[in-house]
Amino acid sequence: MLTCAEPLISPSQIDLRVGHILYCKPHPNADSLFVSTIAMGDDPSSSVITPHAELDLPAEVLAKYSPLPTVRTVCSGLNGLVPLAEMQDRKVVVVANLKPVTMRGIKSAAMVLAASPKAPAGEEASHKKEFVELVSPPEGAQAGDKVFFEGYEGTPEAQLNPKKKVFEQIQPGFKTTADQTVAFDRAQAGWVGEGEKGKVAGEAVARLVTKAGGVCKAPTLKDANIS
C-alpha cells in the first residue's frame, strides 16, 4: 500500500511579509505586551483580519490612513524592550501564517520579528533580553510584500499546523550576519548531519530578501538571534 511521504521542511513554508504598524498601544492586561494594528496586505475576506468596526484607533490615525486598509491585531512581548514611539507608523517583518492565539484576552494573528543579542557563553539562551531591535524591511517595501530566504522560494502554507512544529524547526536558524542582514543559517538550525533528514536542500546561509532584491536587516545588531 502506497503512503504519501511528508513534505520536506523548508523555510518557504513560513509566510513572511512586510507589515506596516499603523498604531500600537500597551496591552491593557499584560505589562510586557504591546497590541499593534498592522496592515499586511490581507484580502478583505480573510478570517484573520480585524473588522474595522472592532478597531479602537485614535482619530488622527484614522484620518492619516483613510481609507483604512485591512489590518490584523498583533500582540508582541516587546513592551519594555522597544520604546512605544518606535512601534508607531513603521514597517516591520511579520510571520503571517501562525495559528492565531489569544494573549491575555486579545487574539493575536501574526508575529513581529525582532533581533536580540545571543546569550553570552555559559548562559542559557533564554536569558533576559535587555536590548531588542525590530527587523526592518528594505526601503520602499510596501505592506503585504512577500519576503523570503534566498534559495528557499516557494508557496507558504495557508496556516502552519502547530502540531507539526514546522516553525519551531526553522526559526532557530534565524540570525543576523556580520552586516546586520537577516538570514537563515542551516547549521544554527541544526540542519546538518542527521539533522538534515526531512529538510529541503538549500543555501548554507540565505539572506531574507524581497522579490526586488532588497535585504531585510536589523539596525545595529550583528550575529544576533531573530524571533
Where do the PLM segments sit?
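Phosphate-backbone binding interfaces of nucleic-acid-interacting proteins
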Residues: 1-227
